[in-house]
């Protein structure tokens, strides 16, 4: 039996030298074995191009959360932290939202946050966040490059290279990578 859920991806966000970059792959997988699309755009700019959001998980759920997050950004005049906290609280307390299976990374030119359905809003200690099926691979690769690699490598290249490494390892991640930088 094939599940009707569409999911799996890898998103990686990196801050270095005051620059923020987020990379995501384009693979949409149905169930555990069927690649339905290889060119999905799961990293995008919102709020007058001032905020970048990346999502992993069930595609329909992720779109719902992205839309709700953008609504919160508008409601709180672009205050990223406030919008993220309000979304997380709503996600946790509204019964209709509790079943949503997705995670978000959101960032502007000042900060990045991970927003989860369990109510967490997490700021990274080291300027790196990664989510999705290949998230741990991308996180490890990005940390290695940022901490031990070429000191001149910018955030954009670290995020992209981390996604490429994750795509080499994770069957739910492909090499069709989109990168957004602030």
Swiss-Prot record:
Name one cellular component (GO) term: proteasome core complex
User: From which domain of life does this come?
Assistant: Bacteria
Q: Which reaction does it catalyse?
A: ATP-dependent cleavage of peptide bonds with broad specificity
The parts of the chain that form a coiled coil are: none
Q: What is its EC number?
A: 3.4.25.2
Q: Which Pfam families match?
A: Proteasome (PF00227)
Where does the record place it? Cytoplasm
Function summary: Protease subunit of a proteasome-like degradation complex believed to be a general protein degrading machinery.
NCBIfam families registered for this protein in UniProt: ATP_dep_HslV (TIGR03692), PRK05456.1 (NF003964)
The protein's name in its UniProt record = ATP-dependent protease subunit HslV
Q: Which gene encodes it?
A: hslV
